[in-house]
């Protein structure tokens, strides 16, 4: 059941900050409503809601720890309730963005550290998508966030990079299995971006920022507005035939 006046709706994880925040706002400018998650920073989530309203769209913030799979059933119920409030029972787009960083050598990485990265960056993506599949419209779109580190080898990033590589493979499996429903699935792999991710490592460290710029063909580190429009574009009808792809958005990093 769908009201003909209902806008297209995206679910975006981690939308209170960084790349997902930028994605929510780019979607808002295109007339797409968002249900986005935040883990703990409700004030920042409320700011995103207000900015989306200024852009003439709707954004609704729901709390979710994507590393806690036991919360996914209750979250799916809240999504159903929110969709009903919006006059529909389906959403159109899913952006699996939320994640955590990890920096440690293979020798020193603990089992606890590895489990945490796996829980949030892979297991959470797998099972949250599974829980939401009954609610996504046939012909919808899914974008998973990968990373340049699934291609570029940076010592100290093995668990993070390997699990983003797993996201690349999962994306192709999802695209194959969801093909009969005409749901496209792609991965967007950002390069080094100036956000608060990983403690603002690229944004706030001038030496690292310069190092990234020097190894990037376009001569600078990325910013959120280099990524959000790409994700929003990939969800549009213009890219309806793009499927099962890993699309690196890095300005030509390490080529």
Name each model-derived stretch:
Residues 147:
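Residue(s) in the substrate-gating loop at a strand-loop-helix junction
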Residues 16-17:
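Conserved glycine-rich cofactor-binding loop
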Residues 91, 105-106, 110-118, 212:
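Substrate-binding pocket helix/loop in short-chain dehydrogenase/reductase
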Residues 187, 210-242, 249-251:
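C-terminal helical subdomain
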Residues 129, 163, 171:
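Active-site helix of classical SDR
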Residues 179, 184, 242-244:
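Short, small/polar-rich loop/turn modules that mediate ligand/substrate recognition or access, typified
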Residues 32-46:
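Conserved glycine-rich Rossmann-like NAD(P)H-binding loop of the short-chain dehydrogenase/reductase
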